[in-house]
Amino acid sequence: MKWGFRWYGAAGDAIPLKHIRQIPGITGVVGTLLNKLPGDVWTVAEIQALKQSVEQEGLALLGIESVAIHDAIKAGTDQRDHYIDNYRQTLRNLGKCGISLVCYSFKPIFGWAKTDLAYENEDGSLSLLFDQAVVENMQPEDMYQLIHSQSKGFRLPGWEEERLQQFQELKAMYAGVTEEDLVENLRYFLERVIPVCEEENIKMGIHPDDPPWEIFGLPRITKNLADLKRILSLVDSPANGITFCTGSLGADPTNDLPTMIREIGHRINFVHFRNVKYLGEHRFEETAHPSVAGSLDMAELMQALVDVGYEGVIRPDHGRAIWDEKAMPGYGLYDRAMGLTYIQGLYEATKAKQNRK
C-alpha cells in the first residue's frame, strides 16, 4: 500500500513536512490548496508549487483532498454547467501535474459535522465527538458557530467563514432538494467529469457522509452499501470510485464494513482508516486507531482490504489531541503518526499470514 498523511499546506497546517517525513515508512501526503473556494479553478502553477514543496522534503504528493464541489452543482441550479466546466479544467490541470487521485464529497451545506471538537477523555486526550441529541436542539447556524468557536483558529474545510456569510443563500438553494434530486445531480456531474478523469488518468473517490445519517433534514446519499453501489452504477468506470472511510461509515453500527469492502473493493480508490467508539445511539467518539480503543475490529477491516487486493493510498484519519499538541482539531501529528504505524503493522501481519498459507 501507499502510506499517506493528510496535509493542509504550509499556511494552513501546524505540522511541517519535515516532521511528517520522519514517520516510519511514510510514502507521501494527500494535499490541498486551502485558499481555493468551491468553484475556483486550480491553476497548473498553483498545483506545481504544492507538488514541488512536498517533493523537496522527500515525499510524494499522493493525491488531492479535496477539490470541493460548488453548491450550484449539488443543488442542480442553472449555474452548475459553469462550475462543472471549472471543475473539468481543474482536473485537466491536475493531470498535467501528474496527480492521479482526487477525493471529493457531495453533501449539502455541511461536509461533516461534530458537536464537540475537544471532548476530554479520562486520560486527558481530546477527541472529536458527535451527539445527535445535541443536534436536535440546534439550528444549522448554531453548528457553524460551534465549529468556529472550537476551531483553535484553523481554517476548517467545509466550515469556511465565507460559507457562514452565505448560509441563508445556501439554505434557500437546497430548499426542496430531495435524496433523489441529489443523486440525479451527482449523475449529471459524474457524466461530465469522469470522461476527463479517464483522459487524465485520474481516479475519483467520493467520501461517505459523516455522520452517515440525515441531519437538519438535509438529504444524504453516501450512508451505506446500497448508497455506494448506486453511486458506482451512475457511471460505470474505474475512475468513478469510493473513498472508503472506516470511521464515517463505521459510525453507524448497522454498516457491516468488512462485507462492504468485499462487495465494492474493486472500486475503492482511497482509504481513510480509523476507529470510532460507540457511546450510545447516534453518539460516538473518534478515538485512537487500535481496535482496543474503540468499537471497530481494525484487524478484520485490514484483512478485508488485503483480501480484495487493495494496494492504493491509505492514511490515518482523525486523531486525538495528545501530549499538549496545538494543532487543527483531529489533525495533530502525534496520534495520527502512531495510527499510521499501527496500520502498517496490521498490513504487515495480515500479508505475512496470507503468505504462510
From Swiss-Prot:
SUPFAM superfamilies (alphabetical): Xylose isomerase-like
Catalyzed reaction equations: D-mannonate = 2-dehydro-3-deoxy-D-gluconate + H2O
Pathway listed: Carbohydrate metabolism; pentose and glucuronate interconversion
Broad class of enzyme this protein falls into: lyase
Name assigned to this protein: Mannonate dehydratase
Function: Catalyzes the dehydration of D-mannonate.
Origin species: Enterococcus faecalis (strain ATCC 700802 / V583)
A molecular function GO annotation: mannonate dehydratase activity
Cell membrane in keyword set: no
